[in-house]
From Swiss-Prot:
Main localization category: cytoplasm
Gene designation per UniProt: mch
Record family assignment: Belongs to the MCH family.
Biological process, per Gene Ontology: methanogenesis, from carbon dioxide; one-carbon metabolic process
Higher taxonomy: Archaea, Methanobacteriati, Methanobacteriota, Methanomada group, Methanococci
Presence of keyword Hydrolase: yes
Any Pfam family the entry gives: MCH
Coiled-coil boundaries: none
Keywords: Cytoplasm, Hydrolase, Methanogenesis, One-carbon metabolism
Protein name: Methenyltetrahydromethanopterin cyclohydrolase
Subcellular location: Cytoplasm
């Protein structure tokens, strides 16, 4: 059985060994847990964002960063590229931000390998038939605050490991690492929608790849939450190899997956969020999806694609001006 925690540990150790190069800070808490500050009190870096994203994906994906000129010849943004041969485990079993970590006054959205020990949420792991077994727990936190010993103790208890074997990586939304890792969810947005909104068995997805632009750091966490989500919703492109069964309507799946199928399509995410009174649960689940979806049905040999990138919404989201 693949272990997302054990597969991610060498990446964590690499980040610790290269902390100065990556502009990170490593903190050992009094209870022995290790905290990696990837953007709260430090600058972080794109390379750190790449490694942070690989850890979010449980060490089961290749992550790269490049400049893509295919969106618009005037709007040039770096892009994060993802590919994985274990889509269900890497994206839903690890990367999905499925753990709301709330301890005292501390709150963060948790993603990454430790979720597969704590089974957060349990229903997801039942759907993909996966659970990790490891004596270490690695959790990625999206927060503008660093966790303390109480948070580490909470994670250790939920994961069933000694607190000295807990690694907590922290990056605010409004940071380079935060921007990279959110765009790095481009494949996961598709598998999440397959499972949660379309009730498709994601274990049939045998390989997945995706690319999405990375948002510039343009303001506080709220503004960045809007911009980072828009990168995937209006700029993300994904490719899925699906081994269908008789009776699976893969063409319908492909048409239903992209963000353009949502009623709120065409508006920057922050605008939609405001209209929902800043309540994620009031937002159409269909909006959390890549802009373009291509599916290769391995059973039938058919190749199909639906959706399109929307550069105008990206420019509006970023308040981009061509000088």
């Amino acid at each position: 059985m693949l272990s997302v925690n054990l597969a991610s540990l060498p990446i964590v150790e690499d980040m610790i060994n290269r902390k100065e190069e990556l502009n990170l800070e490593v903190i050992t808490l009094e209870n022995g847990a290790t905290v990696l500050d990837c953007g709260v009190n430090v600058m972080g870096s794109f390379e750190a964002g790449k490694l942070f994203t690989k850890i979010c994906l449980g060490g089961l994906a290749h992550v790269g960063i490049s400049i893509s000129g295919s969106l618009d010849n005037k709007l040039v943004l770096p892009c994060v590229k993802i590919k994985t041969s274990h889509p269900a485990i890497a994206t839903l079993g690890s990367q999905k931000a499925g753990w709301s970590v709330s301890v005292g006054k501390y709150f963060a959205m948790g993603s990454g390998p430790a979720r597969a020990l704590a089974m957060m949420p349990k229903a997801t792991y039942e759907e993909i038939d996966y659970r990790d077994e490891a004596d270490i727990a690695i959790l990625c936190l999206e927060s503008s605050q660093l966790p303390d010993e109480n948070v580490a103790d909470h994670v250790a208890e939920k994961c069933g490991v000694d607190v000295s074997k807990v690694y907590l990586l922290v990056a605010p939304t409004a940071s380079m690492v935060g921007a990279v890792q959110i765009s790095g969810r481009v494949v996961e947005n598709g598998t999440y929608k397959m499972l949660e909104a379309l009730h498709f068995d994601v274990r049939k997805v045998k390989f997945a790849a995706g690319i999405a632009p990375v948002a510039p750091v343009i303001g506080d966490d709220l503004k960045m939450m809007g911009a980072t989500n828009d990168m995937v919703l209006y700029g993300g492109r994904t490719y899925y190899y699906v081994k269908s069964d008789e009776g699976d309507d893969i063409e319908k799946l492909c048409k239903s997956l992209p963000s353009c199928s949502a009623e709120t399509y065409g508006k920057p995410f922050l605008e939609v969020f405001k209209e929902a009174n800043y309540d994620f649960y009031k937002i159409d689940k269909g909006m959390f999806a890549p802009a373009v979806v291509t599916i290769n049905d391995l059973r039938t040999g058919k190749l199909m694609s639906y959706g399109e990138t929307n550069v105008e919404v990206l420019k509006k989201s970023l308040k981009f001006s061509q000088l």
